[in-house]
Amino acid sequence: MSINLQNVSYTYQVGTPFEGRALFNINLDILDGSYTAFIGHTGSGKSTIMQLLNGLHVPTTGIVSVDKQDITNHSKNKEIKSIRKHVGLVFQFPESQLFEETVLKDVAFGPQNFGISPEEAEALAREKLALVGISENLFEKNPFELSGGQMRRVAIAGILAMQPKVLVLDEPTAGLDPKGRKELMTIFKKLHQSGMTIVLVTHLMDDVANYADFVYVLDKGKIILSGKPKTIFQQVSLLEKKQLGVPKVTKLAQRLVDRGIPISSLPITLEELREVLKHG
């Protein structure tokens, strides 16, 4: 399922003293089966784009096209409902959306809300809970008795149970320890390998380098760079000027270059750095 934004602008709190422009004439494509990352400083418009992708917001001007279904400023909620089923949005702290009395009921709620039978919804819930590493002995527990990391996985399972074709992740590992973050990113990698389109907002450049195949860089509501991670992270000075930074190995390689060691193309992953050091 591909997504296309054509001349999209977004203004929040229109007609109030707090009115402000969040996005300016955004044009972009998210290809079917891709792993696309969005990076940018706070207030750059990343989260606004994420909420446009599944119809949580509608554009002030322009068109958001999801699998050839258009969302405009005039789109009605009932017209957008099918898009929300196919484009799952995982918020920064998704566990805050948990509310049912048991883990299993919470994950099954979404599919039932879209008309799936209780039996099929429960089967989906069990499948997706297993996928995110929640063991069966936790299914009947209250979600709020779980650890923070487990609650996050349950919330993500609830999104996956609705069988989205696109998974939109807004800082999905925020607040997790390194082990929990890596485990969650591995789950998303497996989903991508199975054919799901992944859209990631993150401030962790190593995750962009290790997982994404395309990157959009935003600044003050505009796209200032786009391309493959390898290409984007050659722009060390620009990214640091925008307070974004680069992957750790890229920063190390840049220091070597600054000391006179010739490196034709800065590595962005540990594997690439090993190759550079091996071959000189």
Swiss-Prot record:
Family: Belongs to the ABC transporter superfamily. Energy-coupling factor EcfA family.
Principal place of residence: membrane
Protein name as catalogued: Energy-coupling factor transporter ATP-binding protein EcfA2
Domain of life: Bacteria
Residue ranges of the TM segments: none
Pfam families: ABC_tran (PF00005)
Alphabetically ordered keywords of this record: ATP-binding, Cell membrane, Membrane, Nucleotide-binding, Translocase, Transport
Its biological purpose: ATP-binding (A) component of a common energy-coupling factor (ECF) ABC-transporter complex. Unlike classic ABC transporters this ECF transporter provides the energy necessary to transport a number of different substrates.
Enzyme class: translocase
Lineage: Bacteria, Bacillati, Bacillota, Bacilli, Lactobacillales
Entry keyword annotation includes Nucleotide-binding: yes
Residues engaged in binding ATP: G40, H41, T42, G43, S44, G45, K46, S47
The UniProt record lists the keyword Nucleus: no
Record-level GO cellular component terms: ATP-binding cassette (ABC) transporter complex
GO molecular function terms noted in the UniProt entry: ATP binding; ATP hydrolysis activity; ATPase-coupled transmembrane transporter activity
Subunit structure: Forms a stable energy-coupling factor (ECF) transporter complex composed of 2 membrane-embedded substrate-binding proteins (S component), 2 ATP-binding proteins (A component) and 2 transmembrane proteins (T component).
Subcellular location: Cell membrane
EC id: 7.-.-.-
Bilayer topology annotation: Peripheral membrane protein
Domain (ABC transporter) ranges: 3-245
